[in-house]
A protein has these predicted regions:
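Active-site rim/loop-helix segments in enzyme catalytic domains that contact anionic ligands
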Residues: 1-99, 232-233
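Metal-dependent de-N-acetylase/amidase catalytic core
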Residues: 71, 82-234
Length: 234
């Protein structure tokens, strides 16, 4: 997550669902989004950078708790622009090794409105590569080949994002909505992402069979996978 709230809108359902299924989900916020994604907080009297960052941290921690996430970590790298030096990349790669994730989630590969998002995904792929390298901290367990799912951006057509996976999040929707409402600094997005989940629920129903026996998902999230999936049968 490039900023502290991104995981809530775009992958909150996936986080809550997989935690419920027995996974231990780790959330990484590369920044708090304190400069560029906290307009409501900056309009408050007496706002300072430290106060805004503290508010965003508290909101994100509350949202992660609402989703039941196993862990949330804040790298506090700053935003607008988000930048990571070699040491920060090693920090993320080492975390990937420690967690050994079954899969990863990040932003779309392209975002002309918010370059922090695309940068976060570029770095995620780079750190995945580093974590797979036997010559990085020799002797440690290297990372396998977890799939990278790109969660849905705000304006899909502009971001050249095309979903190939729909995830039914109906059973955990209440958790996601509770997490959404933790993000007081971006209240203008609450209803938008509720409507989006309903629309993706419609797409889930249609793509699972529609009126010919499709599953009755009310809420869903969409993802675009980066790497091929290896299967034993179709």
């Amino acid at each position: 997550s490039a900023h502290a709230a991104d995981f809530v809108w775009r992958a909150g359902g996936a986080i809550a669902l997989h935690q419920q299924l027995g996974y231990e989900v780790t959330i990484v916020c590369l920044s708090y989004g304190e400069r560029g994604e906290s307009a409501k907080l900056w309009k408050e009297q007496g706002a300072t950078l430290d106060k805004v960052k503290a508010s965003r941290r508290n909101e994100a921690k509350a949202a992660a708790q609402a989703l039941g996430a196993h862990d949330i970590q804040f790298f506090d790298l700053g935003d607008y622009p988000l930048e990571m030096d070699r040491q920060a990349k090693f920090q993320l790669a080492d975390l990937m090794r420690a967690v050994q994730p079954r899969f990863l989630m990040s932003h779309s590969l392209y975002d002309p409105y918010n370059t922090d998002h695309a940068y976060a995904t570029q770095v995620t792929m780079e750190c995945r590569m580093i974590a797979q390298a036997w010559g990085h901290n020799p002797g440690e367990q290297v990372l396998g080949a977890p799939q990278l799912y790109l969660f849905e951006p705000h304006q899909t057509e502009q971001m050249q994002w095309k979903p190939d996976v729909f995830l039914d999040i109906t059973s955990v929707w209440d958790r996601k909505r509770a997490a959404i409402e933790c993000m007081a600094g971006q209240q203008h997005l609450w209803d938008y992402y509720t409507n989006l989940a309903q629309n993706r629920g419609n797409h889930f129903r249609r793509n699972s069979g529609g009126q010919a026996g499709g599953r009755s998902a009310r809420y869903a999230e969409g993802f675009q996978s980066v790497y091929p999936r290896t299967v034993d049968e179709l």
